[in-house]
Structure formats: structure tokens, C-alpha cells
Amino acid sequence: AFCGLFGAAAGFRLAEDGRPAREATATILWDTLRARDHLPLLWNVCPFHPHRPGRPFSNRAPAAAEIAAGEWAVRELLALFAVEQVIAVGRVAGTALGRWGIAATTVRHPSHGGKAAFGQQLATVPGR
């Protein structure tokens, strides 16, 4: 466990085959970003992976309370790092950031068939 916070000793389940899991959205995100000469700071407005009960590799929209729970972390990260531009990936993130008064450019979320649009929209964001 890392600092007693993560790992099996802290109550988290680990991959049974010893390999880390690959989440679909993260895979698309990193494959798209790898093609660009830019290393972003990535963070979810919902700090945990929302999934359907009993299906940890599924996706579902986060509940309002789950999104609200992430506001403090987003604000801390923006204060900690010299963030020049915020890009919201998807409407959920864009709406949350707007509600919190954080200026952001919103691009299509890559899930549910949005991979191509995500890449195209990200490529047109000025200032990256």
C-alpha cells in the first residue's frame, strides 16, 4: 500500500492476473494525446470511476453528489500547478466547471462513439 492509502492492505481489490486494468476512455485519451507534443495534467471532475453495480469496467454518468465531491480537488490542482488552459472532456465536465466558475473549453467525450470527434475537436483548441 502506498503510504497506507492504496493497495490490498487499504481494502482495494487488485487485478487478479497482476496486470493493471485499461479503462476504455483513458486508453482513447492517452492514444490521442500521445500523438501530440504536449503533456497535460489530467483530472476527472468526478474523482472516482462511476460504474454500474457489480460491473467495474462499465461506465455510467456520475451522480450530482459524486461530481460535487470532486470540486475541491479540481480547485486544489488548479491552484497547485500553473494551469494555462482548462479543457473539459465532455458535457458533464464542462457543466461542472462552468457551475464552479472555472473557464474551460469543452470537447466531445470519447466514449459511446465519440473517439473521432474528440480527437478532431481537441486538435482545434487554440493555445495548446
Placement of each model-derived feature along the sequence:
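A polyanion-binding, active-site-adjacent surface
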Residues: 1-85, 95-100, 105, 112
